[in-house]
């Protein structure tokens, strides 16, 4: 749960750092860095999943605001967030990736009883089996307004390109969390194998148990080293998604 908070802040910060206007950088980055605001990533839609080129949520310009219409799902920490990095289709005549724009959409922070008090949006929590610290939500937008100044970079149609530039860092951070979860599972399993007694000895001595633990150690080490390698590549300005 705590690690996932960092991922959303990282995505928002990289989007603004690399794609935002100077005014957007000055306004948002200090608040994200200090923890004054909590961002959330609002990309995924029902029946769309990772196919972001098929995003159907629309953001239509109306004077000094964009009016957002559509549905999003699997939005992490959405209720308590203060700002949404919102991917929406600003040009409905352009299909695929070209008609997408990224918005820095402000919203009031919600509560358990009233997760989305902002006008033009509603939603509810999605029950999950694991990762209980990560609260997931589905959101419906019905005329939700975003200021035109909150269009990332000030130009429409760059949303997909801007988003792809951030995913490397987010995936490295997610990989690091996965390695940590796996390491903890391994240590719990190893301790249980040492403490659990059967047939006059610890079950860790049984070949089947020892073999499973050994493969866990090998695969965790591989994942950890690959994560470190990707992080080094990113730090050195090289591609790290290959």
Positions of PLM-derived features:
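Hydrophobic alpha-helical transmembrane segments of multi-pass small-molecule transporters/permeases
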Residues: 11, 171, 209-212
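Extended, low-aromatic, Leu/Ala- and acidic/polar-enriched alpha-helical coiled-coil segments
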Residues: 176, 207-217
């Amino acid at each position: 749960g705590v690690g996932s908070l960092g991922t959303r802040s990282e995505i928002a910060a990289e989007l603004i750092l690399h794609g935002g206007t100077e005014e957007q950088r000055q306004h948002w980055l200090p608040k994200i860095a200090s923890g004054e605001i909590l961002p959330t990533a609002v990309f995924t839609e029902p029946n769309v999943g990772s196919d972001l080129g098929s995003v159907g949520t629309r953001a239509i310009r109306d004077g000094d605001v964009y009016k957002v219409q559509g549905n999003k799902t699997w939005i992490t920490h959405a209720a308590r967030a203060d700002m949404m990095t919102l991917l929406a289709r600003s040009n409905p005549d352009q299909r695929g990736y070209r008609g997408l724009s990224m918005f820095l959409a402000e919203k009031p922070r919600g509560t358990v009883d009233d997760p989305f008090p902002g006008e033009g949006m509603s939603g509810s929590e999605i029950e999950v089996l694991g990762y209980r610290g990560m609260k997931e939500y589905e959101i419906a937008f019905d005329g939700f307004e975003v200021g035109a100044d909150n269009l990332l970079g000030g130009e429409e149609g760059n949303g997909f390109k801007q988003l792809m530039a951030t995913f490397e860092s987010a995936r490295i951070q997610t990989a690091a969390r996965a390695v940590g979860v796996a390491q903890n599972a391994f240590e719990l399993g190893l301790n249980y194998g040492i403490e659990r007694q059967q047939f006059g000895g610890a079950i860790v001595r049984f070949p089947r148990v020892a073999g499973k633990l050994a493969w866990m150690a090998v695969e965790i080490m591989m994942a950890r080293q690959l994560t470190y390698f990707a992080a080094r590549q990113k730090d050195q300005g090289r591609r790290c998604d290959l």
